[in-house]
């Protein structure tokens, strides 16, 4: 892979973390960080998202969306969720795994990519996180988050939500640069949201 990348004149890298990693591995090609993936929606969907996102905000309660393959998101079973925070979950989740979810997690099933933006638009934030750790990013999936552009991030932003991302993730620079969310070091920082 390194040889193939080294032969390229230009590389579209997912983000600035990936650019740094490739340079450390000897790639000297010109690199352009993409920044974020898109999330396709038509004008009607965008208008509906705008209506939803302004109508469902409640005081004294923070609703955080998390969508994706919940079976691989081990942190959802061990994290400590502040009492004024609700983790609203969508995605694939085996019944046995659902029983192990942390207090404060509420599962809503699986929705299509056309339906999910409307459900998460009712939330206050979207969480981009992975790994097995109770508080910090751990494991292979967590390490992957360091270099990956998460489609979750694009979904949440397209749904009108600010995002919550790990400070060392591939999305952290984008979130800071565009002031479109909160960058945290560990899950216990959710109490500051």
Predicted regions, residues:
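Nucleotide-sugar-dependent
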Residues: 114-159, 165-173
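Conserved acidic donor-binding segment of nucleotide-sugar-dependent glycosyltransferases
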Residues: 182-188
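Well-ordered beta-strand positions
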Residues: 9-10, 125, 162, 180
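Alpha-helix capping/helix-boundary segments
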Residues: 17-20, 71, 163, 170-171, ...
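Acidic, glycine-centered active-site loop in nucleotide-sugar glycosyltransferases
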Residues: 172-182
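Conserved catalytic-core segment of nucleotide-activated headgroup transferases in glycan assembly
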Residues: 39-122
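Short beta-strand scaffold positions
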Residues: 13, 165-166, 184
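A short, active-site helix/loop in glycosyltransferases that binds the activated sugar's phosphate group
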Residues: 2-31, 43, 169, 173-174
């Amino acid at each position: 892979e390194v040889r193939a990348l080294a032969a390229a004149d230009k590389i579209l890298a997912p983000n600035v973390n990936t650019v740094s990693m490739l340079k450390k591995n000897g790639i000297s090609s010109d690199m352009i960080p993409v920044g974020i993936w898109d999330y396709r929606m038509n004008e009607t969907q965008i208008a509906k998202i705008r209506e939803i996102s302004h109508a469902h905000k409640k005081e004294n309660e923070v609703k955080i969306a998390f969508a994706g393959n919940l079976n691989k998101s081990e942190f959802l079973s061990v994290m400590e969720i502040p009492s004024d925070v609700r983790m609203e979950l969508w995605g694939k989740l085996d019944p046995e795994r659902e029983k192990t979810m942390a207090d404060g997690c509420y599962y809503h099933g699986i929705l299509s990519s056309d339906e999910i933006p409307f459900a998460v638009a009712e939330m206050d934030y979207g969480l981009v996180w992975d790994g097995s750790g109770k508080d910090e990013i751990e494991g292979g999936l967590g390490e992957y988050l360091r270099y990956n552009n998460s489609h979750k991030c694009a979904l949440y932003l397209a749904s009108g939500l600010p995002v919550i991302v790990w400070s060392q993730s591939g999305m952290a620079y984008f979130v800071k640069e565009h002031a479109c969310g909160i960058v945290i070091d560990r899950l216990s920082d959710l109490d500051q949201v």
